């Protein structure tokens, strides 16, 4: 039976998966989430920790026998028993299916909707409304599946239930008020059944369902942002004033440091977004000359204003042909695509693995067709004149599964493709299948 230590920060929902799995399997698990055993931002930056867990991320697991694991799903899987993992090849595959579903379909919209209500992310109305629609779609899929089932896989709780429940936890606690969750009674019945099991309650405590949808709090968001240091004012006056200035400045700096520390603690405790504080790596695009095209400004136009009348004209008016390039990508293996939601997993999974590329890229990737008859293609905008993926080993996992063709930005073909893919509407003559759904990388 597994025995070891789980390193995490308090209230990390990703760590809950491993903790609940251990409750079911009987694995002996020590939790290191507070000093002196673990201090987030210090312990996970130490040479000893990085020697076992090179990314410095938590949760991280170290067995009493020295066996080490990172990534929450891998840890939860290791700490599970055969019943949780699926006792047949079919059941095991279904468990993996729902674990992937949670990562690619639940977490992105849940984060986009919930994080602003916690004050750790700026509110964007269009992004929030889109996230709500995606959450509705996810809940509808679950509701239909659970219509004739008690649990997601088989007749007993599995790692599928544990993972999806933990992914939905903040939604149910923060924003899924009674009116919103009313159309999905099967999901709520299943969720409540799970969180009231002794093994769940030991880890989660009493889970209170949301009564009123939490909203973005601008004041709370402002309080959680790092404070900008005020410029030092020069003292006027005699020698006595000059002597006092260094002491006064030292006190001010200490106070500023204390104020800065508080938001980081709150953010760390509330959400996995604290993991954003990773060591800065060298910018892969540092060798390129500065461009006049401000990608972030275009993304704001695209997110907040009409695509056809505002965002697209802005794009072409400001696009830097020397500093950026436009590419058409097409998935190489359409014959392997089956269920639509699983095909979308390929897109969202790729987006997640390219997270650090977002500052220098934009893409609209679309799934066309229906179940067992679909294809994937998209338009990508990259900093520079070459594909960005070779610039970092972290970006090379998925791109070889696509064919890439650089477009002539002055051609009618390019303008038509950009228009259709950015707007998610048009004839898409080169595809030959109807639009199913799209994903935006920004």
Curated annotation (Swiss-Prot):
Pfam families: EF1G, GST_C, GST_N. The keyword Zinc-finger does not apply. Residues 281-442 form the EF-1-gamma C-terminal domain. Residues 227-273 are annotated as: Disordered. SMART domains: EF1G. The keyword Amino-acid biosynthesis does not apply. Residues 227-242, 249-263 have a biased composition (Basic and acidic residues). GO terms for biological process: translational elongation. CDD domains: GST_C_EF1Bgamma_like (cd03181), GST_N_EF1Bgamma (cd03044). GO terms for molecular function: translation elongation factor activity. Residues 88-216 form the GST C-terminal domain. Probably plays a role in anchoring the complex to other cellular components. EF-1 is composed of four subunits: alpha, beta, delta, and gamma. This is Elongation factor 1-gamma. The gene is eef1g.
């Amino acid at each position: 039976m597994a025995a070891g230590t789980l390193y995490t920060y308090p209230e990390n929902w990703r760590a809950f998966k491993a903790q609940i799995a251990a409750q079911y399997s009987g694995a002996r698990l020590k939790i290191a989430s507070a000093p002196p055993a673990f201090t987030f931002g210090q312990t996970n930056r130490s040479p000893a920790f990085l020697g076992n867990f090179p990314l410095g991320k938590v949760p991280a697991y170290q067995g009493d026998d020295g066996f080490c694991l990172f990534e929450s799903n891998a840890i939860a899987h290791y700490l599970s028993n055969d019943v949780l993992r699926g006792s047949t090849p079919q059941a095991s595959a279904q468990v993996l299916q729902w674990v992937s579903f949670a990562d690619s379909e639940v977490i992105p919209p849940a984060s986009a909707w919930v994080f602003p209500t916690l004050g750790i992310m700026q509110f964007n109305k269009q992004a929030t409304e889109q996230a709500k629609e995606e959450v509705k779609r996810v809940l509808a899929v679950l509701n239909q599946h659970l219509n004739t089932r008690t649990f997601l896989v088989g007749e007993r709780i599995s790692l599928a239930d544990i993972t999806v429940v933990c992914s939905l936890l903040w939604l149910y606690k923060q924003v899924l008020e009674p009116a919103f969750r009313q159309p999905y009674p099967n999901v709520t019945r299943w969720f409540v059944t799970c969180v009231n099991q002794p093994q769940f309650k030991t880890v989660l405590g009493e889970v209170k369902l949301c009564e009123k949808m939490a909203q973005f709090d601008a004041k709370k968001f402002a309080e959680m942002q790092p404070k900008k240091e005020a410029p030092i004012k020069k003292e006027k006056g005699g020698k006595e004033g000059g002597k006092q200035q260094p002491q006064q400045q030292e006190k001010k700096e200490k106070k500023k440091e204390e104020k800065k520390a508080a938001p980081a603690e709150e953010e760390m405790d509330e959400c996995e977004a604290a993991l954003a504080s990773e060591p800065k790596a060298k910018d892969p695009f540092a060798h390129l000359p500065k461009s006049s095209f401000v990608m972030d400004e275009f993304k704001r136009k695209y997110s907040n204003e009409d695509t056809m009348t505002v965002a697209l004209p802005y794009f072409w008016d400001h696009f830097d042909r020397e500093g950026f390039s436009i590419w058409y990508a097409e998935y190489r293996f359409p014959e392997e695509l089956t269920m639509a939601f699983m095909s979308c997993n390929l897109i969202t999974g790729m987006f997640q693995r390219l997270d650090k590329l977002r500052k220098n890229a934009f893409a609209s990737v679309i799934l066309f067709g229906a179940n067992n008859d679909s294809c994937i293609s998209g338009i990508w905008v990259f900093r520079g004149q070459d594909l960005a993926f070779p610039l970092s080993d972290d970006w090379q996992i998925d791109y070889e599964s696509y064919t890439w063709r650089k477009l002539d930005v002055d051609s009618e073909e390019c303008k038509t493709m950009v228009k259709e893919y950015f707007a998610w509407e048009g004839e898409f003559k080169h595809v030959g299948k109807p639009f199913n759904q799209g994903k935006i990388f920004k």
